[in-house]
Amino acid sequence: MIRYTSEIVSLGLETLRAWPEIWHHRRKVIQCFYDMANASLLMSCVLSLFIGGVLALQSGPVLVERGLSFVVGQLVGLSMCKELAPVMMAILMAGRIGSAITAELGSMKVYQEIDALWTMKINPIHYLVLPRVAAILCALPLLVLFSILVGWMGGGLVSWLNQEIGLSLQAYFSHLKAGISLQDLAQGITKSIFFAMLIGIVSCHHGLQTKGGPRSIGRSVTQSVVQSIVCILISDYAITRIFVWIE
């Protein structure tokens, strides 16, 4: 565990040291960003719409019964901002994008393409890891922001269409707006930046550490996704604790 953590930290620091060279790899970053957004956007839209809808469906009737209909919008808004959108989109990114990164780099490692880069005096960290980490750092916060908006809409539609809740869209969004601040949005975006860095580094690490034949690529992908999700959930608690302490 200590060795694994040190390897992740070492790769993360080396990637950060290579950051001044990001401009030289801008085309690769843009291509990776496009691929990530294209692969995740539709799924994140569907997922967020139903998450917001389920939140309203579960909490709305109970709150309305107790005369707290104004809380429905605030509950959906805060839940999506602070917790559900960042965590769920990060897990989606780990499974959808992180696994692809690990498989790609693992395949290059198995077939000695990484060694060929070293032979040509090309640093794989700069050429392979940096563009992918940078692309995730751009893609995930935007995806989380999009997820928050879609989740709000999902909660609003359920609150409006469900007769047990019976909130108009105007009332729902008015209550939501009253209960949400820019600080709440900033917390969700800040979480997504940390999660993006974790997903990128963990996925690249497992890809670069792949050893053996083609079968080992599958094992690396599985380990990458599992470790990414574990890191996301642990760091989510730590970051939330820091925000609670600051507030």
Cite the ranges covered by each PLM segment.
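Short, membrane-interfacial amphipathic segments enriched in basic
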Residues: 1-27, 206-207, 211
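Cytosolic juxtamembrane amphipathic/interface segments immediately preceding
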Residues: 19-38, 179
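Active-site cofactor/substrate anionic-group-binding motifs, chiefly glycine-
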Residues: 36-88, 92
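Hydrophobic alpha-helical transmembrane segments that constitute the membrane-spanning cores
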Residues: 47-50, 54, 90, 130-159, ...
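Membrane-interfacial helix-loop-helix connectors in multipass membrane proteins
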Residues: 58-81, 150-193, 201-221, 242-247
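Hydrophobic alpha-helical transmembrane segments of multi-pass membrane transport proteins
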Residues: 72-115, 202
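Short cytoplasmic-facing helical segments at TM-TM junctions of multi-pass membrane proteins
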Residues: 105-130, 214-217
